[in-house]
Amino acid sequence: VENNSTTDEIFDYYRKISEDPRIHLICWKKEFNYSAINNFGVKNARGEYLLFLNNDVTVITEDWMGEMLGVCQRREVGAVGVKLIYPDNTIQHAGCVIGIGGIAGHMFVDMPADRTGYLHKASILQDMSAVTAACMMMKRSAFDKVGGFTEELAVAFNDVDLCLKTTKAGYLVVYDPYARLYHMESKTRGAENNEVKVRRFQREIEYMRCNWIDILKN
């Protein structure tokens, strides 16, 4: 899904990959809304498995997609997330815990990627409450059943909300540490201190509190 790119290099890249009949390039011309963009992509997708992948994620292990698919094909699984690593080889994501920071947060952030963490949880295939959608695979049937991403959550918590809807529908959400990718997300990204962004973030927090209060309390 193309979203308001401006550089010549990216359009040269699009022309090159468009020669592959397996690739279908579509353009989102509205303002940024992570949930709406992904829902738009799904409407134009044809497969029974969906892969959500941010543009700042790069491959470490070549078999990462096959690894995710093998887990996602299990009858009881609805979604699969991966181990994401910063360029300095510390952990960016090893699953999400509900309640960290008030709503949800990543486990083992900034821990060296070769460490296994408390009870080896950073290195064990396991069920989670949520995983990040920076790299997440879902069954199409599960995605459709839960209604996709909630578009009121334009930036924050949309993946957490989707995962909670998925588990509520009876599926498992699985963290797979054997699929590893780099995530170039800035470790020093500033706070949401723009007034418009602050108000948007507060609305998203309120949405999560209103819709998932029973889970957040526990």
Label each PLM-derived region with a short phrase.
Residues W64-M68, A122-G147, E151-R180:
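A short, conserved alpha-helix in the catalytic core of glycosyltransferases
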Residues V80-K83, D176-P177, M184:
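Short glycine/serine/threonine-enriched helix-capping/active-site loop
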Residues V57-I103:
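Conserved donor NDP-sugar-binding/catalytic core segment of glycosyltransferases
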